[in-house]
Amino acid sequence: MRDLVIDNTLDSFFWAQYADLWHNSKNRSPFQAPGILQFFSQKYTNSVIAIRLLREQSTVGAVLLKKEKNIYSFLSDLKTDANFFVFRNNCSDGDIDNFFAGLLDFIKQQHSAVIFNNVASWAGYFPVFEKCAAK
């Protein structure tokens, strides 16, 4: 069973789960590393959310976003212009599709927009993202 979770409070349990995800991810971008994102999240405590996909209570995908007015952007935009989603090594295309569909539905429900600044088009998940975005 897959569940999309929106975290408004990033506590120690969240960071332990995120660190495990990042260490076991397909693309371990240093700009998505737990330490740097935790540092940034502490500077924008009321503006940061994490969107996670859970499969059997384990985090298999995540992104951290910062909200200004009605616009979400990658939290990592504070340091880099190359942005990545984080997916566990054993994440299936079905998991990734579920993650992106849930993410885009969440943005629509919030009557918000999301800015994906320089998403890594070469990343293995990108074709699934394009298909979801085209729906």
Predicted regions and their residues:
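N-acyltransferase acceptor-side catalytic subdomain
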Residues: 1-135
